[in-house]
């Protein structure tokens, strides 16, 4: 019982079949309040407890506990805390002729309330709590504050989970700006016209054949991607081998990032020049000029600055001897 008292009253359920057996085997209008008095929801300082104790020790109060109408009638003459039946399923189901209009629901409603006497006016009654008796089980109805608080807590919890999920969705790109979903590329393939529908019903595919087709399609896709990667790698190596030593500039850049310098490539330029006497394939040959023949005129002195050859020296010696 101590553990039950520590728990919130709105979260517990109380029932006692043994007390029901002691009270005649079923609950009715005259014993429902006494059955409720055995539950942890009952307050021992209420007017119900004091009136029951007085009826046990005073014969003049005995008739107050025989019927519920007499018991509640006596409570109305007192002020303070009390428990009264707010809804009686037997009275609600019975008609004026004493017959039942429908089967009783066996759900009782009990109010915990305070009564204050006012001279010349009706009593001021304030309802503090509401309890339900379903069969032999007693429940406490939750308050409006508890219901609203639970609803708000559920909404706040859902919003918190939403914010955690949405925090990872925003994405910023210079092209699209702030987006909350990844951009979907539009397909450029034109939709193929659908075939003419058949008048007969299409047979449903078997599960095994569908699974086998899915597995075969996945394997063919993987094989195609592996072949494409291998082909791309081979082409890359071929381009590297063929054009790996060529540069876009005559003077390639050397150095580290941030401190590049232009290198001199004289050796490369000299090596690219073709040797003398060789012609590049595809070039037009140049026409060679006619060699000039030198003709010496007798009696004409050679030009200054020219060194006489051996034949000229012999002619001069012969002329000198003939003159002597």
Curated annotation (Swiss-Prot):
Tagged with keyword Nucleus: yes
Which InterPro entries does this one have? Mediator_Med6 (IPR007018), Mediator_Med6_fun (IPR016612), Mediator_Med6_sf (IPR038566)
Q: Give the GO molecular function terms.
A: transcription coregulator activity
* Keywords from the UniProt entry: Activator, Nucleus, Transcription, Transcription regulation
Q: Where is the composition biased (Low complexity)?
A: 274-287
Instruction: One GO cellular component term, please give it.
Output: mediator complex
Q: Which GO terms describe its biological process?
A: regulation of transcription by RNA polymerase II
**Basic residues bias: start-end ranges:** 315-324
Which stretches of sequence are listed as region Disordered?
A: 172-217, 254-324
What family does the entry list? Belongs to the Mediator complex subunit 6 family.
- Function field: Component of the Mediator complex, a coactivator involved in the regulated transcription of nearly all RNA polymerase II-dependent genes. Mediator functions as a bridge to convey information from gene-specific regulatory proteins to the basal RNA polymerase II transcription machinery. Mediator is recruited to promoters by direct interactions with regulatory proteins and serves as a scaffold for the assembly of a functional preinitiation complex with RNA polymerase II and the general transcription factors.
Its protein name is Mediator of RNA polymerase II transcription subunit 6
Task: Name the source organism.
Answer: Aspergillus terreus (strain NIH 2624 / FGSC A1156)
């Amino acid at each position: 019982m101590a553990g039950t008292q520590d728990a919130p009253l709105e979260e517990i359920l109380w029932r006692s079949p043994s007390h029901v057996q002691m009270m005649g085997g079923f609950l009715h209008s005259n014993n429902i309040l006494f059955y409720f008095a055995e539950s942890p929801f009952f307050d021992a300082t209420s007017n119900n407890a004091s009136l029951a104790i007085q009826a046990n020790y005073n014969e003049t109060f005995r008739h107050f506990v025989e019927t519920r109408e007499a018991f509640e009638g006596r409570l109305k003459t007192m002020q303070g805390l009390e428990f009264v039946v707010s809804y009686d399923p037997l009275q609600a189901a019975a008609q004026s002729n004493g017959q039942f209009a429908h089967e009783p629901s066996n759900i009782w409603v009990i109010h915990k309330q305070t009564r204050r006497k006012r001279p010349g006016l009706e009593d001021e009654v304030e309802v503090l709590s509401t309890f339900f008796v379903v069969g032999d089980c007693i429940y406490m109805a939750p308050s409006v504050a508890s219901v609203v608080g639970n609803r708000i807590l559920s909404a706040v919890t859902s919003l918190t989970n939403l914010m955690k999920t949405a925090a990872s969705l925003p994405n910023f790109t210079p092209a699209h700006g702030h987006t909350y979903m990844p951009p979907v590329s539009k397909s450029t393939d034109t939709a193929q016209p659908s075939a003419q529908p058949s008048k007969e019903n299409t047979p449903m595919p078997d599960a095994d054949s569908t699974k086998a087709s899915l597995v075969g399609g996945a394997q063919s896709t993987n094989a195609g991607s592996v072949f494409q990667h291998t082909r791309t790698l081979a082409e890359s190596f071929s381009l590297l081998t063929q054009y790996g030593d060529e540069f876009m500039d005559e003077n390639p850049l050397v150095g580290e990032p941030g401190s590049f310098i232009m290198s001199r490539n004289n050796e490369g330029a000299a090596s690219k020049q073709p040797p003398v006497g060789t012609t590049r394939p595809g070039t037009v040959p140049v026409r060679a000029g006619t060699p000039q023949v030198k003709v010496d005129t007798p009696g004409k002195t050679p030009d200054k600055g020219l060194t006489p050859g051996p034949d000229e020296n012999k002619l001069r010696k012969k002329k000198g001897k003939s003159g002597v």
